[in-house]
């Protein structure tokens, strides 16, 4: 019986709660809100001043009724009720900021230099406006290497346009086939007094605009790669005032001929590296160019890829003049070069300081001398050499290599047998 009475009492209480909830939805909440008072302070959150709590006896029903967010209220009405409300704007000005309060770590030039090296030129320019220390570090990086390319031409030239002191050591134009007028307008803002490296990568419209610009005669590197429009006359006029040129890259400049090369040798006596590789108009570079280049005293790197009019005569000429100084030799695609030059020269242990030899697509069939030369360099001189061969040559090269090692092992066995027989 006790269990039945307990269940009945619980059911009656629940039914009473349901009735209250149905007829007065906020009655119990309002009652609790009525009794709640702000007269008792909590030390952690309650202000210590005198506060007016006139709303402490206000019911939650009244709060909901007087709230700006009325049920069914139109959005325009809601906006009108809030239009007088505004947020206080916090204005932060770099010009008025106190640098002395910033973290001292951001005033260490060496650390800033390491961080700034990861930024593009437009970001560097913004950093240069923060304070004098940042300006000095950013300027040193900008002035070291200025790269102008299609994807960021506006950002790069903004630096030139706004900074009157841009005098880079290296200036590179990368894949610019348009914007000639824009660049011509900004070019006078660049100072070329410290320039030692000038590079044009697939930018055919640019070299001609330097006709009216005085380039420093201290320029040591000039790259005009992928320019099919520049001719002998334009190139010669560009290099006339460059007596200290050391590195010249003319890859894929298909209009350049022997005439330019002879002029380069005359006006650039300090030249050490030249690349004449091409895929078109290969007949314009002949043995005459190599004969002229071999007269350069400091020549170390030569590239003739695709120049199929160059013959064994040129290789022998290079050997006679630069046997000990040549470091890199690329004759990829020079189909007239045969075993009569390369194989015979390495058999004499010629070019002992050569580090890279590219003989892809040449008419070579005797590789034993090259293999022995490579092993000799590695074992006795401790100067490894990288020999690049084409896929069509690889099979024959490996076959001759295996045969050579087999002969070597046979010779060792014969020597051991002879030694044993002599001992007995």
UniProtKB/Swiss-Prot annotation:
Cross-referenced SUPFAM superfamilies: F-box domain, RNI-like
CDD domains: AMN1, F-box_FBXW2
Keywords: Cell cycle, Cell division, Cytoplasm, Mitosis, Nucleus
The keyword DNA repair appears for this protein: no
Gene Ontology BP annotations: cell division; SCF-dependent proteasomal ubiquitin-dependent protein catabolic process
Main location group: cytoplasm
Listed Gene3D superfamilies: 1.20.1280.50, Ribonuclease Inhibitor (3.80.10.10)
Compartment(s): Cytoplasm; Nucleus
Pfam families in the cross-refs: F-box (PF00646)
InterPro entries xref list: F-box-like_dom_sf, F-box_dom, Leu-rich_rpt_Cys-con_subtyp, LRR_dom_sf
GO terms for cellular component: cytoplasm; nucleus; SCF ubiquitin ligase complex
Similarity remark: Belongs to the AMN1 family.
PANTHER family: F-BOX PROTEIN YLR352W, PARTNER OF PAIRED, ISOFORM B-RELATED
Function of the molecule: Negative regulator of the mitotic exit network (MEN), required for multiple cell cycle checkpoints. Required for daughter cell separation and chromosome stability. Involved in copper sensitivity.
Name listed for the protein in its UniProt record: Antagonist of mitotic exit network protein 1
Lineage: Eukaryota, Fungi, Dikarya, Ascomycota, Saccharomycotina
Gene that encodes it: AMN1
